[in-house]
Amino acid sequence: MPIPWDELEIGTETGRVELTLTDEMIDEYLASMDSDHPWFAGAESPAGERTAPPDLVPKLAMTALFQDYIQRDIGPNIRAKQAFRFLAPVRSGMRVKAVGRLVEKYERRGKRFITLEALFTDEQGTPLVLDRRTQLVLSPDFQMPA
């Protein structure tokens, strides 16, 4: 059951994730994207070791960080915009963690929007990726046209 708009609190935790990035995760992602870029397919990256495609970790974590919360507490919605800031390479074998939060809610031209954000860090707390996404919140009785 969606939380009423007036009761949505800025700062609410939307989810958390902790994962260790493996070569297998990178390989599966590259295969799905039909990519063999040498920075990601081997150890030829400027970082000196195998790195993950920049958007891999946010995609792996999307459900735990945002989607479960949105489906449970927000209800029908459409992604309105999304932006990543890639701050440091994510390397194979790296342990990564993030906490998702509701950081903004607003109304524009009679429509309601929420913004969610997660900062991915390594075990030492080094910022790796900032994922920020805005969702258009649809009315609870919204139905897809047949």
Residue ranges and their predicted role:
Residues 1-81, 142-146:
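Hot-dog-fold acyl-thioester-processing enzymes
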Residues 1-5, 86-146:
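HotDog/MaoC-like acyl-thioester-processing domains
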